[in-house]
């Protein structure tokens, strides 16, 4: 049991890794076989903005700190609503049990508010480094999101389609003005 948990958990952030996310989806799909209705699902594909700058400038310890702080925010805003996974690198996916656009938008705004309240984790970074840093406003840690949603989702293929839609939206955001979200 502990080995399975270790194989499904991102050891740095404590959230599911990609394999863990797909395992959770397989378990949900198995559970849905006996139900007449599927689940309403919202999916947020999240990419950290300016992460590479901090990781390259201040080192991997600071990159790790940022990943942990972001994962904690995602975990906090999704408690009781869904799962969070580190999809790879500085990308995260939140799968939430709602297809209500307004609720999904409130969750996105809560994420941005929490990041903004930390000034892009400036104090945490300075504490870790042991000295102050100058951060240009355009270099603050933020995130960009692609958000997709659907009703009556019954299988992993449907979730894979939501991931693709959200990833495409995320790409659109990242090629424009970062630090925003876009809905399907």
Where in the sequence are the language-model features?
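Conserved nucleotide-binding and Mg2+-coordinating catalytic segments in signaling enzymes
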Residues: 3-23, 46-60, 68
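Short regulatory alpha-helical coupling segments
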Residues: 4-5, 18-39, 71-79, 97
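Short, conserved catalytic or interaction motifs in soluble domains
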Residues: 56, 97, 175
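Alpha-helical scaffold within the catalytic cores of cyclic-nucleotide enzymes
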Residues: 71-72, 103-134, 167
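A short pre-motif secondary-structure segment
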Residues: 83-86
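Catalytic strand-loop-helix junctions within cyclic-nucleotide turnover domains
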Residues: 95-104, 124-138, 142-162
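Catalytic/regulatory signature loops of cyclic-dinucleotide turnover enzymes
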Residues: 152, 161-184
């Amino acid at each position: 049991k502990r080995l399975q948990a270790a194989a499904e958990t991102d050891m740095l952030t404590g959230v599911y890794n990609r394999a863990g996310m797909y395992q959770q989806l397989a378990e949900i799909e198995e559970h849905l076989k006996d139900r007449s209705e599927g689940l309403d699902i919202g999916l947020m594909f999240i990419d950290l903005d300016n992460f590479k700058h901090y990781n390259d400038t201040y080192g991997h310890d600071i990159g790790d700190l940022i990943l942990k702080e972001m994962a904690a925010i995602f975990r906090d805003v999704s408690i009781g609503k869904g799962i969070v996974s580190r999809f790879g690198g500085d990308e995260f996916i939140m799968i939430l049990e709602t297809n209500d656009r307004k609720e999904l938008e409130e969750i996105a705004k809560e994420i941005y508010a929490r990041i903004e309240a930390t000034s892009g984790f400036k104090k945490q970074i300075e504490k870790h480094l042991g000295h102050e840093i100058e951060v240009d406003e355009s270099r603050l840690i933020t995130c960009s999101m692609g958000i997709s949603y659907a009703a009556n989702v019954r299988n992993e293929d449907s979730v894979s389609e939501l991931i693709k839609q959200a990833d495409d939206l995320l790409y659109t955001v990242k090629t424009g003005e970062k630090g925003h979200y876009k809905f399907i």
